[in-house]
Amino acid sequence: LQTYTADTITLDNDKIEFMADSTSVWAGMRLYDLYKQAYTPWEWHEELFRVAKEEGLICFSSPFDKTAVDFLESLDNPIYKIASFEITDIPLIEYAAKKMKPMVMSTGIATEEDIQLAVDTCRAAGNDDITLLKCTSSYPAPIEEANLCMIKDLAERYGVKSGLSDHTIGSVSAVVAVTQGATMIEKHFIIDRSIGGPDASFSMNEQEFAQMVKDIRMAEAAIGSVSYELTDKMKSGREFSRSLYVAEDMKAGEVITEQNVRSVRPGFGLHPKYLKDILGKKVNQDLEKGTRFAWEFVNS
């Protein structure tokens, strides 16, 4: 959720700097009017938290000022999410961090210094449970600007967990983010895009969201772990690897060549790496085509 009112996030003002960017989907709107249209009524929060709990979901919110933090504390809000445009609001970050709840911070418009200051502020407040979200603050965000390799770097550079706040259309970015180490995915949700709304164009409906979750779980399973140990299934598959076999009927004393002993499937014969060692030597017995080649067939 997002917990704000138009008055806690901006000023009721007609100056040009209080207008939405001309390149955004909200071009021409006053920020005050946009936020007045987009905000979630605070009186809805209690019921949303209650229903989420009944459904086994974790409900939490982004506060946009200290009054929102105080209000959310009354609902036992379990996590605080700092939006991209609030990452420079150090007093807000400090106030929320002191509640000693996990802190999630989006980095859409943040410089490296902004991020470091926000992380340091949390830690100075005694709160080290921090997740940084890679975010592209365009609505919708072009997928070629997702820059998902940042997810891994955020975790390593700042010593935190990392994830993705995704404003691209579709689920590709979210699935790829998991392969980059994302531990959290934020995606806008809408029941029906046809009803419209400030974020309708880049929100997912129920079916799309469910499919995204399935795809993410499959991606997590596909990542696996670094291991060169063969599973039982892989070991059985080695039966179909290459090995040395007698390719022509051979008589005792016949010289081994690349024509009469070859590296072929299946894998029950001598390892192919030994072919160069046996070429030019003689076999010590008659051998039938299709015989697994072994050291014991070579004259000593």
Task: Please place each PLM-identified region on the residue numbering.
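Catalytic cores and adjacent flexible loops of soluble metabolic enzymes
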Residues: 1-300
